[in-house]
Each structure stands twice: as C-alpha cells, then as structure tokens.
A protein has these predicted regions:
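Conserved alpha/beta core of the MobA/IspD/sugar-nucleotide pyrophosphorylase nucleotidyltransferase superfamily
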Residues: 2-17, 172, 176-219
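Nucleotide and nucleotide-moiety/phosphate-recognizing core
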Residues: 12-160, 192-199
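Nucleotide phosphate-binding site architecture
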Residues: 29, 40, 171-172, 215
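Short phosphate-engaging motifs
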Residues: 70-73, 170, 213
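Short beta-strand and adjoining strand-loop segment in the mid-core
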Residues: 107-109, 169-174
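Short, loop-centered acidic/histidine patches that primarily coordinate divalent metals
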Residues: 155-157, 166-169
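Short glycine- and hydrophobic/aromatic-rich loop-to-beta-strand nucleating segment
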Residues: 162-166, 206-208
C-alpha cells in the first residue's frame, strides 16, 4: 500500500466512511520551553487553526479538540474555527487533569465523538507539514486495507508517523481503557489488526517538539 491510493480529489467518494477526528492540543510543550503549541503561528496561521482547516478540507464529519494546558491561549482560536464546520460538528473538550498523559487526552477526545462514526483519525496539533492530500491518502490506505485491519498508521522507513486512523472497535476499547493503545506492546499484541502503511512522505514525521524544530519553520 502506498500513498498514491486515493490521493486525488474524488478518489474517496465511493463507500464513504463517516470519520471523526481528535485533534490533540492539551500538552504542556515542556520540551519547547513551555509554550502553547496550538497558538504557534506558522506562515501566519496558528497550528490549531491549520489542523482544523485541513480536517475541514478533507471532509471529516466530526472533530473533537482536546485542550488542557494553556487553555486560555488556545480556546479563543476555537471561535475562529467555527466558520470551518457546520452545526455541532466541532467540539472542544478540556483535559481536567494537570499532569495528564497523552492517553488520557486521547480517551477524552474519542469519548466526545458520536457513536455514528465509522473510524477515528487522531492528529497531534504540532504537525505543520501535513496537507489535505496527506490526510486523503491515509483515508485511502485505510479504505483499501485488507479485511480485518482495524488500524492504519503511516510508517516512514521504520519510524511510525501521524496521523493515524482506526476503527470504531478500537475507539470503544480506548474509551473503556483497555490496553496501552499505540505502544510497542499494543502493536505487537494487535499486529493482526495493524497496517504499517509504508510511505516516503516525511510530512507524517514532521512535528514541533523543541526550539530547534520551531526554528526550522520560522526562519
């Protein structure tokens, strides 16, 4: 499976999935010196709005944005994002635990999606290289995966990337707190569910974790 599958507009029109997305924006940005990643502007656009824009462009049906640390900086951006989505397709949920793990935010976000979604896409907020085409390609890989595949994630060489897309079955397990989702042990245990979708697209790896990462984007 390569990223060319479903990479053009219109390729994903048949057998349409109802997709919910979780945009993770609750972290404390400790390695970045303590900054709200969602409020960082790249080419004049805050990362939170960029992530929501490409999710809107790809046509996801619902989005849950998980905020937490720096809520006061990130939350006002949600008002600007409402123009991208109709009705109640966009919700914000706030992680109440200050010292939380990403798994806690993931569980909160997935639980905020309706039971009507067929699959869930999880996107960290700090991935400025991603485009609409990258997300469409991931959806295509998921739709064209072999029967029994429940999870598709991009893999560049041996490095797992983001975003990932998984089934309602996995979403239910996450909400119920079953297993350490996404860990090496989980991937080994659930290898029959997992498609490590091979691609050479570095967009799936590019994130902003450190000041050096950020410098590479603002210079």
């Amino acid at each position: 499976m390569t990223e060319e599958v479903c990479s053009e507009p219109g390729d994903c029109e048949t057998a349409r999935l109802k997709i919910g997305a979780v945009l993770l924006a609750a972290g404390n940005g400790a390695r970045l010196g303590g900054r709200a990643k969602g409020a960082i502007e790249i080419a004049g656009e805050p990362l939170l709005l960029r992530g929501l824009r490409i999710l809107s462009e790809v046509g996801v049906d619902e989005v849950a944005v998980v905020t937490g640390h720096y809520h006061s900086e990130v939350s006002p951006l949600m008002a600007q994002a409402e123009r991208l989505f109709d009705d109640d397709r966009l919700v914000e949920v706030t992680q109440p635990i200050a010292d939380h793990a990403q798994a806690d935010s993931l569980r909160l976000g997935v639980a905020s999606l309706s039971q009507e979604v067929d699959a869930v896409m999880v996107l960290p907020v700090d991935m400025p290289a991603l485009t609409r085409g990258d997300l469409v390609a991931l959806i295509g890989a998921y739709k064209h995966a072999d029967p029994g595949i429940e999870f598709v994630g991009p893999t560049v060489g041996t490095r797992p990337g983001n975003p990932v897309l998984f089934s309602r079955r996995i979403a239910s397990q996450i909400v119920q707190g079953q297993g350490d989702f996404g860990s090496g042990a989980w991937r080994h245990q659930r290898s029959d569910w997992l498609l490590e979708w091979q691609t050479d697209n570095l967009h799936y790896l590019a994130d902003i974790d450190t000041p050096e990462d950020l410098d590479g984007w603002i210079q």
